[in-house]
Swiss-Prot record:
Belongs to the influenza viruses PA family. Phosphorylated on serines and threonines by host kinases, including human casein kinase II. It comes from the Viruses. Mn(2+) 2 binds at E80, D108. A motif (Nuclear localization signal 2 (NLS2)) lies at residues 184-247. It is an enzyme of class 3 (hydrolase). Binds 2 manganese ions per subunit. One of its GO terms (biological process) is viral translational frameshifting. It comes from Influenza A virus (strain A/USA:Phila/1935 H1N1). The keyword Manganese applies. Keywords: Cap snatching, Endonuclease, Eukaryotic host gene expression shutoff by virus, Eukaryotic host transcription shutoff by virus, Host cytoplasm, Host gene expression shutoff by virus, Host nucleus, Host-virus interaction, Hydrolase, Inhibition of host RNA polymerase II by virus, Manganese, Metal-binding, Nuclease, Phosphoprotein. This is Polymerase acidic protein. GO terms for molecular function: endonuclease activity; metal ion binding; RNA binding. Its EC number is 3.1.-.-.
Length: 716
């Protein structure tokens, strides 16, 4: 930045800025952004004054350089850039000769035509915010304020801009040029973020008129005026005072502020009980795909055509049988449902022309699986209000479940790389501004780190399934439509690939409200034997449906192929959010960006390239019982993405509550680590609020276990 300033600004301006910084005891080698800001401000003040004169008639005129009348009186007196004592001498002299009111702070210019002092502001923030800060600082009705920004905006007292449009345009153009020059060298972001507000911002901002009346009316009880209240707040000592006030409120309220020490927090209590079970809407690490490469068949892109083509790639089908029954379900119905799907797909293949959609016959097994006619009949309240024992359904408390190891395995798998790419680089036009160039560069680096990630596959799978299900729910409300579960990707060699995970059959879907439920049966292929972790598959009936030949180090081996079948349900609002799962990419990109920004502001240059290309550097990823886990920047990207994706896949009220309440505890612990000596009252109540969310949800239980690891290592 220092080199840039010396190249970009006139040596006289640079010299003045150096003197100013020396006067205030600031080191320009360290405060390089401050150095650039002072130079910019000086240049704007000089440009403001340039070419403006007053003729013998007292009129303001503009005279370009080289004009013979250059002996005219300058319209503006420049105060900025002078030695402090000289500057105050000039101000005093002006006040004595013109009768102007003496300002509290040194202004930048004096305008002999309008007879007023001018405060010039150059801001990297919003002009109106900076204007208010200046107004609050000067406190003088007489000092005129004129603010310029690097984006070409300006603001002045009473919209009186003093100069003609051309002179102001010259200043704006120069500021825009400085911004572009900085951006092209990767200096702009750091410079933009380094601006601090006016030092005297804490001084009182006078409130008058209506606002004053409103302020006086909205005071808490027992305060007669705003000044009274301000004095009370300024002299407020929290400890002891809060306790005293609370004890006056009620005999039941008793809050002592306890110091929060390293020994204060205890681990969260995770529930005991049977292990938690899988509750995602589709299989994750256990899913198996039937795939076709370079699809070019007739009707390619029509889901049903693609599904049939994928089904034809497998030849190991066999008579299906139940290997892991669903405890509460009628398992033969699940078996019959799969047989029905196979039979109806065979019927389609025998037809001359394959239809675009397939509605299943409403057999007894599908009616049972989809809960047809199972909903209790709705009766008008007026017809039954005389019934004596009218009551709401008894609903059982949810059964407590313990954390199982499978959910950590699922998360680890989601962070891994697959051998296919699941998203394309956006086709976006040429970058116009330097900031767009940096944004594109970051997006491209990030995309290359996550495009092959399994979490990205889950995003695309989720988007496809939810879109297809919502479309079918609206287009075929009464039908049991067969919906293939499909995704598309590219192989390492860049060849297109279409994958089939299984099928969904949707039930009746007259969805009037956002929360109205549509039932569906999912049937998904897998090579995972459910008998290895039966607790994970509590909600599923699992069939063995074939044998698959797999290549291995010892040649080809045959593995049984399973079908995971379950009844499930979703709503319009859940499907809407499922369709928008791509937002997870954006959320994790923004988290990475804030890491880059933090690094860039320390180094005072854009660190995007170094951030992604320095393969030797490791970053903290998360906490585990072993301590802080570290990994490459790519691993960080994929871990953040997987967390965001799991928040979407396992969204629930338990997760909402846990995230909100545990965050409070996290902030207290963080304050302790930062030596801020936090105090708490009713810490037990906070623990209760967190722990009431730990019931049976696998993702929430895993997050709670991570939280405990964090507590252990953070407070060592």
């Amino acid at each position: 930045m220092e080199d840039f300033v010396r190249q970009c600004f006139n040596p006289m301006i640079v010299e003045l800025a150096e003197k100013t910084m020396k006067e205030y005891g600031e080191d320009l080698k360290i405060e390089t952004n401050k150095f650039a800001a002072i130079c910019t401000h000086l240049e704007v003040c000089f440009m403001y004054s340039d070419f403006h004169f007053i003729n013998e008639q007292g009129e303001s005129i503009i005279v370009e350089l080289g004009d013979p009348n250059a002996l005219l009186k300058h319209r503006f007196e420049i105060i900025e850039g002078r030695d402090r004592t000289v500057a105050w001498t000039v101000v005093n002299s002006i006040c004595n000769t013109t009768g102007a009111e003496k300002p509290k702070f040194l202004p930048d210019l004096y305008d002999y035509k309008e007879n007023r002092f001018i405060e010039i502001g150059v801001t990297r923030r919003e002009v109106h915010i900076y204007y208010l800060e200046k107004a609050n600082k000067t406190k003088s009705e007489k000092t005129h304020i004129h603010i310029f920004s690097f984006t070409g905006e300006e603001m002045a007292t009473k919209a009186d801009y003093t100069l003609d449009e051309e002179s102001r345009a010259r200043i704006k153009t120069r500021l825009f040029t400085i911004r572009q020059e900085m951006a092209s060298r990767g200096l702009w972001d750091s410079f933009r973020q380094s601006e601090r507000g006016e030092e005297t911002i804490e001084e009182r901002f006078e409130i008058t008129g209506t606002m004053r009346k409103l302020a006086d009316q909205s005071l808490p009880p027992n305060f007669s005026s705003l000044e009274n209240f301000r004095a009370y707040v300024d002299g407020f000592e929290p400890n002891g005072y809060i306790e005293g006030k609370l004890s006056q409120m009620s005999k039941e309220v008793n809050a002592r502020i306890e110091p929060f020490l390293k020994t204060t927090p205890r681990p969260l209590r995770l529930p005991n009980g049977p292990p938690c079970s899988q509750r995602s809407k589709f299989l994750l690490m256990d899913a198996l795909k039937l795939s076709i490469e370079d699809p070019s068949h007739e009707g390619e892109g029509i889901p049903l055509y693609d599904a049939i083509k994928c089904m034809r790639t497998f030849f190991g089908w066999k008579e299906p049988n139940v290997v892991k029954p669903h405890e509460k379900g009628i398992n033969p119905n699940y078996l019959l449902s799969w047989k029905q799907v196979l039979a109806e797909l065979q019927d389609i293949e025998n037809e001359e022309k394959i239809p675009k959609t397939k509605n299943m016959k409403k057999t007894s097994q599908l009616k049972w699986a989809l809960g047809e006619n199972m909903a209790p009949e709705k009766v008008d309240f007026d017809d039954c209000k005389d019934v004596g024992d009218l009551k709401q359904y008894d609903s059982d408390e949810p059964e407590l479940r313990s954390l199982a190891s499978w959910i950590q395995n699922e998360f680890n798998k989601a962070c891994e790389l697959t051998d296919s790419s699941w998203i394309e680089l956006d086709e976006i036009g040429e970058d116009v501004a330097p900031i767009e160039h940096i944004a594109s560069m970051r997006r491209n680096y990030f995309t290359s780190e996550v495009s092959h990630c399994r979490a990205t596959e889950y995003i695309m799978k989720g988007v496809y399934i939810n879109t297809a299900l919502l479309n079918a729910s609206c287009a075929a409300m009464d039908d049991f439509q067969l919906i293939p579960m499909i995704s598309k990707c590219r192989t390492k060699e860049g060849r297109r690939k279409t994958n089939l995970y299984g099928f969904i059959i949707k039930g009746r879907s007259h969805l009037r409200n956002d929360t109205d439920v549509v039932n569906f049966v999912s049937m998904e292929f897998s090579l995972t034997d459910p008998r290895l972790e039966p607790h994970k598959w509590e909600k599923y009936c699992v069939l063995e449906i074939g044998d698959m030949l797999l290549r291995s180090t010892i040649g080809r081996v045959s593995r049984p192929m399973f079908l995971y079948v379950r009844t499930n349900g979703t709503s319009k609002i859940k499907m809407k959010w499922g369709m928008e799962m791509r937002r997870c990419l954006l959320q994790s990109l923004q988290q990475i960006e804030s890491m880059i920004e933090a690094e860039s502001s320390v180094k005072e240059k854009d660190m995007t390239k170094e951030f992604f290309e320095n393969k030797s550097e490791t970053w903290p990823i998360g906490e585990s019982p072993k301590g802080v886990e570290e990994g490459s920047i790519g691993k960080v990207c994929r871990t953040l993405l997987a967390k965001s994706v799991f928040n979407s896949l396992y969204a629930s009220p338990q997760l909402e509550g846990f995230s909100a309440e545990s965050r409070k505890l996290l902030l207290i612990v963080q304050a302790l680590r930062d030596n801020l000596e936090p105090g708490t009252f009713d810490l037990g109540g906070l623990y209760e609020a967190v722990e009431e969310c730990l019931i049976n949800d696998p993702w929430v239980l895993l997050n709670a276990s991570w939280f405990n690891s964090f507590l252990t290592h953070a407070l060592r």
